[in-house]
């Protein structure tokens, strides 16, 4: 039962990460419900981040995502909610989800290396990284939804994402072949339903840290 609940929670987290443009459809969700099966590993308070206060639009989302260890801040005590999600951040989140799903441990970072390198190695060793992944020195660049889909389609096994949905992808014909299977897998599993009433994927779009924190915590 615990395994099933964890799988469902992880599917919902992935769903949220890839559906940030459809926040309205989750307006009635209970804050923190999606991540309730995960233990808190942190405790955000008023002094945790200098740029997120109780009046910030994404405060509750940031607090839940931080407390669950899904998203953390920067060394200068900022969260930077309006920044686009970077490759390094997406890879880190994917590694954490995959490790939680598989009961794996992620190695401690080596001394004097970039903070994301242990997560990069974790994903690289498991064949999770898309071919478009930039060089390590450029992982601070923003990641688009095509590459998010590819990356997060690798986090949960196919048998735990059965086909339960028949939504037609509004812009399927424009999705590059390399990403099509990942997008179709996530649509079929009901993990994502697109960003508008036509269920378009809009793969070249990016998303912000505040948006992701808000939706994954619902």
Language-model features and meaning:
Residues 4-12, 18-59, 72-146, 154-181, ...:
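Feature responds to low-complexity, polar/acidic, surface-exposed segments characteristic
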Residues 63-68:
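Mature N-terminal segment immediately following signal peptide/propeptide cleavage
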Residues 69, 190:
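Phosphate/pyrophosphate-binding loop motifs in nucleotide- or prenyl diphosphate-using proteins
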Residues 183-186:
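Extracellular C-type lectin-like domains
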Residues 209-211, 215-216:
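Non-catalytic cell-wall polysaccharide-engagement segments
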